[in-house]
Amino acid sequence: MLKREMKPESDRPRKVRFRIASSHSGRVLKEVYEDGQPSGSLDSECASICGIDGLGDSDGQQNGHIESEGDENENDQDSLLVLARAASEKGFGTRRVNILSKNGTVRGVKYKVSAGQALFNNLTKVLQQPSTDLEFDRVVIYTTCLRVVRTTFERCELVRKIFQNHRVKFEEKNIALNGEYGKELDERCRRVSEAPSLPVVFIDGHYLGGAEKILSMNESGELQDILTKIERVQHPHECPSCGGFGFLPCSVCHGSKMSMFRNCFTDSFKALKCTACNENGLQRCKNCAG
């Protein structure tokens, strides 16, 4: 039987407990073995520049890279260097942790998903803030031109004719032509704790009511008193460009919603949509908007 030669203890490779690496270049600066004895300075010049020679275990976790090696899989799997920065990311309050390989290449970023979620949550809160646009001496009517529900369409026509008979200037927002008007109506009705049932009238930025309320105020003469400060229209006429709808087909995609970068030779751009118009392929009429 062959006897295995016993290697002296000094020649056995010592297992590394952790390594301290530079946060900029990824260069290993110091190694600490399982027996507690640190190795010699691997890069004294870089260590002196970075100021990491006197770091302990806790300081190394905050200002440098910590590399841990498993006892069983240290030869099969690549060891990962984890950079834990003490400075928290601005606006998120979480540490940015880069997962690096031995040669310093970035293999992943911890807390990236949570940071992205926090970013989009903050953007949503900003976009949901109430509008600061003033509506002094303005009449805004939210209507629809869809005739799926006949009673709703007839009430919208009734309210429109009432304000036309008073010869006042009003702005009609048709939620069937622009989905943003529907979101705006839901937000404004939510502030006043009212159900968004079309049509809805706002005067001077204040909620006035629906078709029944406008009809009763018109019959009692109260509506005429409210409209005394609203701008009058002596000769009402429809816009020759849009016919009074306030929207025109998109001048870029002509209402098809197809992007100008899309072609018929490949399917890679199938999901691209035109960004110059709304979801219905319409643009605001420049004559009415002006």
Swiss-Prot record:
Cell compartments where the protein resides: Cell projection, Stereocilium; Cell projection, Microvillus; Cell projection, Kinocilium
Function: May play a role in actin filament architecture in developing stereocilia of sensory cells.
Glutaredoxin domain residues: 127-234
InterPro entries per the UniProt record, alphabetical: Glutaredoxin (IPR002109), GRXCR1 (IPR042797), Thioredoxin-like_sf (IPR036249)
Keyword Nuclease attached: no
Name of the gene encoding the protein in the UniProt record: GRXCR1
One Pfam family hit: GRXCR1-2_C
Natural source organism: Homo sapiens
Name of the featured protein: Glutaredoxin domain-containing cysteine-rich protein 1
